[in-house]
Amino acid sequence: MNDLCNRYGSCVLKPLGRKDRIIAFPWGNEDTETLIEIFDQYNVKVTFFVVGEWVDKYPESVKALHDAGHEVMGHSNDHAHFNSLSADQIIADITACNEKIKAVTGVSPTLVRPPYGEYDDHVVSTVRGMGLEIIQWDVETLATGAMPWGARV
């Protein structure tokens, strides 16, 4: 990860000396209220990266996350591989997702987490040209095994 950050001059990695956590995972909305309750119980605020299609399906969950004080940021509109898209396609994809998030929360996202963690010079320059920053994970949750998420929270 640090090699990628060095290559692109900057990279946002959380936590930034604080106890911030960023969560991005595919899920329905059946556990949204449970997640909010657990995070509230521990006084934890989270940045959720959501796909625009998820916002379409579950706007009430996006609003609930936002209303509970969590950040909602973009993770693309339809989980496309940004590395294989033109600049115009990337811009259209991110814009569509961000407009959906803003319509529900009233807040324009400032961060983008590229699908599959894929990005290159082309993607970085396109995203930064939109006035946004790319954020990346530093823990791969698939490596944690089959432990239920509630046991890890």
Describe the function of each predicted region.
Residues V124-V153:
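His/Asp/Glu-enriched short active-site or ligand-binding loop at hydrolase and phosphoryl-transfer sites
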Residues E33, S84, H122-V124, M147:
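Hydrophobic alpha-helical membrane-insertion segments
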Residues M1-H81, L85, Q89-P109, L142:
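Active-site beta->alpha N-cap acidic-glycine motif
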Residues S76-D78, Y116-E118, D138:
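Short, flexible active-site-adjacent loop segments at beta-strand->alpha-helix junctions, enriched
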Residues L65, I91-A92, Y116, V127, ...:
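Alpha-helix boundary/capping detector
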Residues A103-M130:
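Basic- and aromatic-lined ligand-binding clefts that recognize polyanionic substrates
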